[in-house]
Amino acid sequence: MKIGVLGVQGDVREHVEALHKLGVETLIVKLPEQLDMVDGLILPGGESTTMIRILKEMDMDEKLVERINEGLPVFATCAGVILLAKRIENYSQEKLGVLDITVERNAYGRQVESFETFVEIPAVGKDPFRAIFIRAPKIVETGKNVEILATYDYDPVLVKEGNILACTFHPELTDDLRLHRYFLEMVK
């Protein structure tokens, strides 16, 4: 199994390190043709407007949508969730539009208002998961086929729809590998 990490911007290294700890072969994906070389793909946190601009400049956006629609398992964190969302509230931004959610960008505040908390994620075990929110988006609406796996303050923070897992916080910034392991199970 080979897992790609989209290498255009953001927390690329942290996701690669998490996957290496789990003994998984990785590929930092920087070219459209590399999307055919991976069994699953992580879209890291970063800055969503920069990420979509780079994807378009590299002609990777359409290929990425094609691969996701073909069933490529994808794990998006923070800005990656914004890229996948069908709708963005109160902000005009290009997106891939493959996940049936509405998001609000930077909903928890600016960088200085970033925070950590613990969330319950029954799908990965009974122990609380340390969630780090950095300029995180908020999922304000989910489609009927979107499964909510975790919430914070009654808002979804971890959702799944088919082959897509989307997390508004940064699991790659913790030592807890349970969400990466959960994603690998989706890929198998």
UniProtKB/Swiss-Prot annotation:
Lyase recorded as keyword: yes
Reaction equation(s) it catalyzes: aldehydo-D-ribose 5-phosphate + D-glyceraldehyde 3-phosphate + L-glutamine = pyridoxal 5'-phosphate + L-glutamate + phosphate + 3 H2O + H(+); L-glutamine + H2O = L-glutamate + NH4(+)
Enzyme active site: C78, H170, E172
Annotated Pfam families: SNO
Coiled coil stretches, renumbered: none
Presence of keyword Cell inner membrane: no
Gene3D superfamilies: 3.40.50.880
CDD domains with a match to the protein in the record: GATase1_PB
Key words of the record: Glutamine amidotransferase, Hydrolase, Lyase, Pyridoxal phosphate
Molecular functions (GO terms): glutaminase activity; pyridoxal 5'-phosphate synthase (glutamine hydrolysing) activity
Pathway(s) this gene product operates in, as recorded in its UniProt entry: Cofactor biosynthesis; pyridoxal 5'-phosphate biosynthesis
GO biological-process terms attached to the record: glutamine catabolic process; pyridoxal phosphate biosynthetic process; pyridoxine metabolic process
EC numbers on record: 4.3.3.6, 3.5.1.2
Residues that bind L-glutamine: G46, E47, S48, R105, I134, R135
A cellular-component GO term for this protein: cytosol
Family listed: Belongs to the glutaminase PdxT/SNO family.
Function field: Catalyzes the hydrolysis of glutamine to glutamate and ammonia as part of the biosynthesis of pyridoxal 5'-phosphate. The resulting ammonia molecule is channeled to the active site of PdxS.
Oligomeric and partner information: In the presence of PdxS, forms a dodecamer of heterodimers. Only shows activity in the heterodimer.
Database matches in NCBIfam families: PLP_synth_Pdx2 (TIGR03800)
The protein's name in its UniProt record: Pyridoxal 5'-phosphate synthase subunit PdxT
Taxonomic placement: Bacteria, Thermotogati, Thermotogota, Thermotogae, Thermotogales
